[in-house]
Amino acid sequence: MENSGKKYQIDTEENKMFLGELQKNLLNFGKGFLSPGGSAYFLGDDGTPWKDRNRETWITCRMVHVYSMGIMLGDKESPALVHGAVHGLLEELKDCENGGWYPGITPDNKFLPDKQCY
């Protein structure tokens, strides 16, 4: 097999470098997700936050998961992103009166109806 195909062979140096680049690119892509209150914006194809869309709880949870993995991988910006998103789950998205979490928040900061997260 020629050298260029080695990046697809598990555990070769080329494969490790290739996967490391993909990992770095994926983590860098999503770093704009965090809203000021901690909930997660949807992102466009270039990673730009879509501030005109709802910020949903499940996306915020996903980003906590992704950037928690980033912490384990040594990404220096991931701890602040996880902290901000967890803050959003504990404050902005949480229904402190009735328990559970709101499904999301509209761009004008109104809660989405039909709570599903308890």
Listing of model-derived features with the role each one plays in the protein:
Residues M1-Y118:
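Glycan-recognition and catalytic cores of secretory/periplasmic carbohydrate-active enzymes
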